[in-house]
Amino acid sequence: MTEYRKPTPAEIEALTAAGNSAENWDAIEVAQNFTPAQLSGCRLEGRVQIGRGARLRRCTIRNYRIGEEALIEGVTALECRRESSFGNGVRVAAINENGGRTVRIYDRLTAQTAYILAVYRYRPEAVEAIERMIERYAAERRDTLGTVGPHARITGARFIREVNIGKGATIDGASLLENGTVCAGAYVGIDVQARDFIAAEGARIDGGTLLERCFAGECCTLDKH
């Protein structure tokens, strides 16, 4: 487990000289082997943890944990403004769009579980038991800090708010991501806008796709073109 420390006065001086600033340097934590060269032209607000080897360039970050070897470059705002479950527990209309058969999404949802929740309405006890489990899971995921996983890459994006980003995930040029989870290995591309969503492992969302209250399943591709 990574051990964190406060940046030293000499490191803060070097960071400031490289165009970085912080709302409160006392709220910033860095890995033991941190070097100021990891940051350039960044604004840090609230509480920020910076993992080993993470590189931050020309971005604003608020209330996030940045995993080791992650890259964040050219991001207008990566921020967690409030406590969030990061898309876990959101109700999504299934089968019809009138909301009569909603499914609570979460980042471990399977097709089998979703089918039971949407179709087995004649088994209310089973459905209620699964929904209670999902509610507990969503409560466990609640946090005031967002997470960028190890080796994740976020480049050229605009606004990312209350979104957890998994190990090795890539976000390249997304316009707006809000209240969601991008799981390990998933890809979110140019001009994508998504709210209240989960992108499962290996999912690919690209081409200006618009998502709202949606679960993009494992290795699924969503593209306007």
Label each region the model flagged:
Residues M1-H225:
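Domain-scale signature associated with acetyltransferase and cell-envelope carbohydrate enzymes
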